[in-house]
C-alpha cells in the first residue's frame, strides 16, 4: 500500500513540474511586441517596379521592411535594399505574402506569444511564422538582410 502511495505522489510531482514548465514558457516582453499598421504617407525614394511603399521601423542598413504596392490597395510585405545616400533604385529582395496581397490598414504584429503575423484589416491571416510559444523574445532585421526571431539567449528560432 505504501508503494502505491509513493508512486501516486511521484506522479503528482511530475504533473506539477510539467504544468509549471508549460506555464513558464518564455514570452515576448512588452517592450519588444509591436503592431505596424499599413496606413499613412508613402515613401519618397524611387523603388523597383515603380511601386508606392510605406517603410516600417525594423531597419538595418541597407535593409528595411516595407509594405509596397503596384496595384491600388494590394500590398506586399517586403524587405527593401538600398542606401539612403544613393540615388540608385532600391530593390525588393524578399516578400512575405507574394500572390496573397493585403489591403490598407493590414497589420504586422509580433505578439507576446512570439508569432509574427501579417493580417489583413478584416483579420484574415496572409502570412505568419508559426512560432507561437517557441521561446521567441525579439524580432530583428540584421545588416545581412536576414530577419530573425530570437530566444532569450540570442539564438535564432527562425
Regions found by a protein language model. Give the residues of each.
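Extracellular/secretory-pathway, disulfide-rich ectodomains
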Residues: 2-158
